[in-house]
């Protein structure tokens, strides 16, 4: 496994994309017949942060959203809410490899970007220009591609105020100069792109990712800064430990049967507590109202568990759970929070989402649904096409009771550990 990312040049990437389209009728190995073609009358079209979304789904901040070609591939397959990989001031981190284990449920020891801050910005700018160019070249309807780039930043206010992060936030707010240069490169292969008005602002919204153990006043200070000083619609990524030790363990170990996955006491000890989260979220909703912005939560982060599998380096004492078992935990957390806020808390959902449960998540009130673990399985980005097929059956204004769905997830065979499943009597 390679130890370092080495992004290719913009001219090489653009040549690859447009030449492959002309010579093979495919892009990045995806044949044209599998491109998602948006429809104006699609039942799943929606909005977030005052932007139109052709679909409410996309890749979660993670391995799928670090390089331009990955972002473009996900867009071609129907992703329209794209969470960009988390960027932080420390951009020379040593990531243990392998860092992802997805034999079934997911475990990882990876965290923020593996590129320099300026390299991350460049990747996102390339993807932005390519998406706008391909939207026109492929003849898709609408003047704009109906896509939202959701920034992800971390991990504390001191880091976000560092010069490289200040430059990054400035660049995402106005990348006109670099966007213009990239449009010129694209025009060498597709001259009509020069006639497009590709926006210089890549994003006006952000998800705050904080370290485990970040105190509520720090989370509140960072979020307030992002709204008051940066004018960004803001989501706070919450940890599943917010459900509390009894809530998490009863679902994970008892209901779902993942008895090997041990959530240590310290995970609950250093993470944000529910009693502290509620006043914090109320305060931040008030700040958002004062700023004329939207504020909400992303549910959820991964779950800290003891490293019991022989995959990661022995020095990794903890690893982070994702995928199937996290779904039930996070849905039950969503139910608890929405009960607290009378269903008015803006929520983006990312925890064990798949093609079958995504319509349910939209119907219980999730504004967007993002995916990571499921995309790391066979099919990759093409799995998004089945998500959209399932969303086609979504009735306008369809609503499902969140409390009932939360209860259902605790015994859903698709979430239960395979070693915990028992055959019906007639099959024995």
Q: Where is each model-derived feature located?
A:
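Conserved small/polar residues in nucleotide/adenosyl-binding loops
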Residues: 419-425
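Active-site beta-loop-alpha junctions enriched in small/polar residues
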Residues: 62-64, 87, 239-243, 300-304, ...
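Glycine-rich phosphate-binding active-site loops on the catalytic face of alpha/beta enzymes
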Residues: 83-89, 364-386
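C-terminal helical cap(s) of enzyme catalytic domains, especially alpha/beta-barrels
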Residues: 94-106, 377-399
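Structural preference for beta-strand elements that scaffold enzyme active sites
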Residues: 56-58, 81, 146-154, 233-237, ...
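N-terminal capping/small domains of soluble enzymes
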Residues: 1-223, 229
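Catalytic cores of alpha/beta
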Residues: 353-366
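Glycine/Thr-rich beta-alpha phosphate-binding loop at enzyme active sites
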Residues: 27-40, 244-343, 378-393
């Amino acid at each position: 496994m390679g130890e370092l990312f080495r992004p290719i040049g913009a001219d090489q990437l653009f040549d690859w994309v447009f030449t492959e389209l002309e010579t093979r009728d495919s892009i990045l190995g995806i044949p044209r017949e599998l491109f998602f073609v948006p429809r104006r009358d699609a039942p799943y079209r929606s909005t977030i942060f005052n932007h139109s979304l052709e679909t409410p789904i996309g890749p979660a901040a993670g391995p799928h959203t670090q390089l331009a070609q990955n972002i473009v591939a996900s867009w071609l397959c129907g992703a329209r809410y794209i969470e960009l990989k988390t960027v932080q001031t420390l951009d020379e981190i040593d990531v243990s490899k392998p860092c992802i284990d997805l034999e079934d449920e997911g475990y990882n020891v990876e965290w923020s970007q593996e590129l320099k801050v300026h390299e991350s910005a460049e990747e996102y700018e390339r993807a932005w220009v390519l998406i706008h160019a391909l939207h026109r070249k492929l003849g898709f309807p609408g003047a704009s591609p109906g896509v939202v780039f959701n920034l992800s930043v971390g991990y504390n206010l001191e880091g976000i105020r560092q010069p490289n992060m200040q430059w990054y936030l400035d660049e995402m707010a106005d990348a006109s100069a670099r966007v213009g240069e990239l449009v010129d490169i694209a025009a060498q292969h597709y001259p009509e792109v020069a006639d497009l008005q590709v926006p210089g602002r890549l994003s006006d919204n952000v998800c705050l990712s904080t370290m485990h153990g970040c105190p509520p006043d720090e989370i509140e200070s960072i979020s307030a800064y992002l709204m008051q000083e940066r004018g960004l619609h803001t989501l706070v990524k919450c940890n599943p430990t917010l459900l509390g030790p009894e809530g998490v363990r009863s679902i994970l170990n008892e209901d779902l049967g993942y008895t090997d996955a041990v959530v240590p006491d310290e995970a609950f000890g250093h993470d944000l507590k529910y009693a502290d989260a509620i006043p914090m979220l109320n305060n931040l909703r008030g700040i958002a109202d004062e700023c004329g912005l939207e504020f909400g939560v992303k549910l959820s982060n991964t779950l800290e568990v003891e490293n019991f599998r022989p995959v990661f380096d022995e020095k990794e004492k903890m690893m982070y759970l994702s995928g199937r078992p996290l779904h039930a935990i996070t849905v039950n957390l969503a139910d608890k929070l929405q009960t607290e806020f009378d269903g008015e808390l803006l929520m983006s959902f990312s925890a064990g989402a798949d093609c079958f449960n995504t319509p349910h998540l939209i119907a219980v009130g999730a504004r967007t649904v993002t995916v990571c673990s499921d995309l790391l399985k066979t099919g990759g980005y093409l799995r998004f096409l089945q998500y959209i097929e399932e969303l086609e059956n979504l009735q306008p204004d369809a609503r499902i009771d969140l409390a009932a769905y939360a209860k259902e997830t605790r015994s859903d065979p698709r979430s239960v550990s395979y070693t915990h499943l028992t055959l019906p009597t007639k099959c024995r």
